């Protein structure tokens, strides 16, 4: 199991957004040996949220050889302009882009762009096919109920051929795992929505679905994203972070988040990660909620060695 780092695109109230802050974070992740950086996406949220594709483009020159990715709202962004923007990021990163697509769980993101939230799953399936069609240069194109690429020749196309890998988010439902197997190049699981035993059960189902769609389960990658993190030996600080920051942000009870996220001592955090490693998680994207540069260092110095001695 290896590790990536979420970009600090949420304002938790401790520091202002700046290019210098993002750059320092990414350079630190690069120098510490993180394998990838990832920007998650919302148009509006309970806290201010920096635009994900813009943030990702801004840090390319600091990212070295790390993979760069975004878990992006494929429908809300619009599949054609999104495909255009992501193709540019792949070119400017010299082919290091991977794309995470998810419909999102916030109805407000849909309301503000006048898209029916109840249509999201049908639109989502089509949006993925639209992006693949545009990136591959498919002469036939794609025509669905909501979208069509007929007559569109989107240029320039991504550097990576036939396209950057498309990973699909699923919390582990049967329908979601079928979608991952049918349309995806990898599976994005959510840390705060997926306990290790749930991940193990979902991974078993996913492998069955991959066989149905003629894909090799052994070579199909997975990753655990949104692993919010604050490493501290201070028990009172642990409780403050859980109760005052993460519960409000994620709308989950404290006890659930205490079980699932990396909040607490290095030993506690390492034990949680070891459990995910044991059930087949291949990569975990950590998301420090404050003191982010120092938290990256603490993670590498005090947590990772306990997981991978």
What are these regions (language model features)?
Residues 78-183, 204-206, 213, 218:
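Internal, glycine-rich beta/alpha segment that forms the wall or movable "lid"
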Residues 128-132, 197-207, 292-309:
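C-terminal helical cap(s) of enzyme catalytic domains, especially alpha/beta-barrels
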Residues 50-70, 127-130, 300-309:
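Alpha-helix-loop-beta-strand connector modules within alpha/beta enzyme cores
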Residues 6-20, 72-80, 162-172, 255-267:
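Active-site mouth loops of central-metabolism enzymes
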Residues 16-29, 82-85, 170-179, 264-275:
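Short, acidic/polar
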Residues 3-7, 37-39, 67-71, 97-101, ...:
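Hydrophobic faces of well-ordered beta-strands that scaffold small-molecule active sites
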Residues 1-14, 106-108, 147-164, 235-260:
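N-terminal small/glycine-rich loop or linker at the start of catalytic domains
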Residues 1-62, 162-164:
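N-terminal beta1-alpha1-beta2 module of alpha/beta enzyme domains
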């Amino acid at each position: 199991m290896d590790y990536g780092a979420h970009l600090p695109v949420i304002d938790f109230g401790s520091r202002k957004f700046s290019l210098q802050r993002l750059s320092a974070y990414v350079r630190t992740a690069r120098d510490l040996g993180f394998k990838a950086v990832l920007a998650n996406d919302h148009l509006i949220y309970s806290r201010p949220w920096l635009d994900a594709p813009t943030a990702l483009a801004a840090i390319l020159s600091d990212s070295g050889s790390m993979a760069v990715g975004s878990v992006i709202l494929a429908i809300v962004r619009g599949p054609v302009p999104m495909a255009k923007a992501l193709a540019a990021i792949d070119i400017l990163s010299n082919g290091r882009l991977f794309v995470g697509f998810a419909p999102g769980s916030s109805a407000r993101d849909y309301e503000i762009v006048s898209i029916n939230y109840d249509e999201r799953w049908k639109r989502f399936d089509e949006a993925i096919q639209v992006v693949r069609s545009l990136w591959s240069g498919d002469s036939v194109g794609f025509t669905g109920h909501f979208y069509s690429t007929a007559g569109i020749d989107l240029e320039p196309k991504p550097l990576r051929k036939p396209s950057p890998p498309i990973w699909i988010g699923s919390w582990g439902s049967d329908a979601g795992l079928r979608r991952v197997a049918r349309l995806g190049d990898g599976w994005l699981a959510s840390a705060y929505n997926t306990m290790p035993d749930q991940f193990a059960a979902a991974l078993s189902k996913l492998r069955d679905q991959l066989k149905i769609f003629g894909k090799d389960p052994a070579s199909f990658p997975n990753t655990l994203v949104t692993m919010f993190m604050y490493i501290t030996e201070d028990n009172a600080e642990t409780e403050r972070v859980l109760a005052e920051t993460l519960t409000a942000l994620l709308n989950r009870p404290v006890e659930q988040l205490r079980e699932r996220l990396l909040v607490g001592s290095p030993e506690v955090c390492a034990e949680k990660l070891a459990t995910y490693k044991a059930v087949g998680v291949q990569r975990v994207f950590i998301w420090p909620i404050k003191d982010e540069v120092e938290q990256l260092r603490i993670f590498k110095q005090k947590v990772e060695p306990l997981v991978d001695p």
